[in-house]
Design a protein with these regions (language model features):
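Secretory targeting signals
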Residues: 28-86, 118-183, 223, 227-242
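Helix-loop-helix units of permease transmembrane domains in multi-pass membrane transporters
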Residues: 91-125
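Transmembrane helix-loop junction
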Residues: 96, 109, 140, 144, ...
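Junction motif at the cytosolic side of a transmembrane helix
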Residues: 14, 242-262
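Membrane-helix interface segments
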Residues: 19-21, 112-114, 118, 155, ...
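Aromatic- and glycine-rich beta-strand/loop motifs that create alpha-glucan
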Residues: 1-29, 182
Length: 262
């Protein structure tokens, strides 16, 4: 087995055996379950009125009880929830050895640092995409059980593209989370970075600059602020790509040259 294959296998085993990815998946599952509850409330206005604030929240979040509204809710949940839960997974993957003080043992293995970092990024990408696909599948099941109207194969196909596209725009930006978790040698600095980018993304979107701020693009793509054609341009996607590449390159550079004996 090559050094890269060994690193990938080790990272995969760590992910499978840890409860962190499972808890992230459970947390992500709350989105379609809550969406199904909102649809159920909106389908029964008499019962909804007796629920007071819950009914009001459902109207604000979803609006109407149909598949388009349900899919929109899921897409926006992937943008908001993904920014947090994908970051938690990334922080754990890159920060665990520093918090456990086992990074020196990791680097003592006959495997290049580049192979280790690549393996970590691959595990993050595969797991976060798997989480997204799971949420879409769970959403289909929940929506079918609630029996909401407006279903069509074309709508489901469009929703799948929107949800997957939102995730694909979010996942590469985790490269900066990986960098901060590595340079900060633990979890807390990366958590701080995640909160900072969420706050700045909301401010940028409100100020009308979201299309120029990489961390605001996934939320705008999800339709949280209106039709994406009115919010985003080609430059928005280019900025996400460039920012992600900068974070990726900086992470590789840091792992290659940093003194890991401290």
């Amino acid at each position: 087995m090559t050094g890269f294959a060994s690193a990938l296998w080790a990272e995969t085993l760590k992910t499978i055996r840890s409860k962190v990815p499972l808890f992230c998946l459970i947390g992500f599952s709350m989105a379609p379950l809550a969406g199904g509850l909102f649809m159920l409330i909106l389908k029964n206005p008499d019962a909804a009125r007796s629920m007071g604030l819950i009914s009001t929240k459902a109207h604000i979040m979803a609006g109407t009880a149909d598949w388009p509204a349900f899919f929109n809710l899921l897409t926006q949940a992937v943008a908001a929830g993904g920014a947090i839960l994908f970051a938690i997974l990334t922080i754990w993957v890159f920060g665990r050895e520093f918090s456990d003080h086992t990074v020196k043992e990791l680097l003592a293995l006959p495997t290049s640092r580049e192979a280790i970092v690549t393996a970590k990024f691959i595990v993050i990408a595969v797991w976060t995409l798997a989480m997204t696909l799971f949420i879409f599948g769970l959403g289909l099941i929940v929506g079918s059980l609630v029996v909401i109207p407006g279903w069509s194969v074309e709508l489901a196909r469009t929703a799948f593209i929107n949800i997957l596209g939102t995730a694909v725009l979010t996942i590469p930006l985790m490269s900066f989370v990986a960098l901060i978790a590595s340079a900060g040698r633990g979890y807390l600095p990366a958590f701080g970075w995640t909160i900072l980018t969420l706050v700045l993304a909301n401010i940028a979107a409100v100020m009308g600059w979201g299309d120029w701020f990489p961390w605001a693009v996934p939320g705008l793509f999800s339709g949280a602020a209106g039709p994406r054609t009115e919010q985003l341009g080609l430059h928005s996607y280019v900025i996400v790509i460039l920012a992600s590449l900068v974070g990726l390159a900086a992470t590789f550079y840091w792992w290659r040259d940093a003194d890991q004996t401290r």
